[in-house]
C-alpha cells in the first residue's frame, strides 16, 4: 500500500541512484509497539525526505490488513495518516531475505518456507545507499521499539562520510568532527577529544 493505494509490484529498484532508503520491518498490524513506530516515522518523514531518503515499512501482514489499519484512527490504535509505502510480505520472502523472520520454520526441497509456528518479522532497520548497498542495519527484539532519531542520525553519518571521506566516531552527530580513516587521523581526533 503506497499513499493509500494498492501497488502490485513495489520494488526498491524504484529508488536506485536517486534516494537512500530506510527499510524497516515491524512484527504485525493492529498490535502495540508497532503503531508508535509507524507514527514516529511519519512525524519525521519530512526530515527523511529533506535528506533524499525514502522510508518503507514492511510486515508479514497482507495488503488488505495494511489497508484496514491505515483506515483506523490513531485514537483507536490505528495508523491513519501514514503516507509512506507499507509492503505486504505475506509470503515472508523479504523478511527471510533480510534475516529478520522470527518463528519456527524451514525450507523444503522446492525452496518453499514451511512453518510450524506464526512467522513475523523482528524490528529490523536497514539503511540502503543510492547504489542499493546496505550500509547500516539493526535488529530489535519484538518488545523493543526503535529510535527514529537514530535512523536520521545514521543517514546523516552516511552522507557525511560520502561527502567528506571522513568516518564518524562514536556519538557523532551533525556539526561534530569526523576523522580521517587512518592512524594519523584517529590520533589527531583522539588528541582533541
Q: Model-predicted segments: where are they?
A:
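Chalcogenol-based redox active-site neighborhoods
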Residues: 1-193
Amino acid at each position: 500500500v503506497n499513499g493509500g493505494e494498492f501497488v502490485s509490484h513495489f520494488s526498491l529498484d524504484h529508488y536506485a541512484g536517486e534516494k537512500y532508503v530506510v527499510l524497516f520491518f515491524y512484527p504485525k498490524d493492529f498490535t502495540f509497539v508497532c503503531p508508535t513506530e509507524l507514527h514516529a516515522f511519519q512525524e519525521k518523514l519530512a526530515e527523511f525526505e529533506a535528506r533524499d531518503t525514502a522510508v518503507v515499512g514492511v510486515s508479514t501482514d497482507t495488503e488488505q490488513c495494511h489497508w484496514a489499519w491505515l483506515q483506523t484512527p490513531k485514537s483507536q490504535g490505528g495508523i491513519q495518516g501514514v503516507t509512506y509505502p507499507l509492503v505486504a510480505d505475506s509470503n515472508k520472502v523479504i523478511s527471510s531475505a533480510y534475516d529478520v523472520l522470527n518463528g519456527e520454520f524451514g525450507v523444503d526441497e522446492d525452496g518453499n518456507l514451511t512453518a510450524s509456528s506464526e512467522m513475523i518479522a523482528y524490528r529490523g532497520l536497514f539503511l540502503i545507499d543510492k547504489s542499493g548497498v546496505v550500509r547500516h542495519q539493526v535488529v530489535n527484539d519484538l518488545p523493543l521499539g526503535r529510535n527514529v532519531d537514530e535512523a536520521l542520525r545514521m543517514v546523516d553519518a552516511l552522507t557525511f562520510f560520502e561527502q567528506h571521506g571522513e568516518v564518524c566516531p562514536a556519538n557523532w552527530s551533525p556539526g561534530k568532527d569526523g576523522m580521517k580513516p587512518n592512524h594519523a587521523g584517529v590520533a589527531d581526533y583522539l588528541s582533541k577529544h
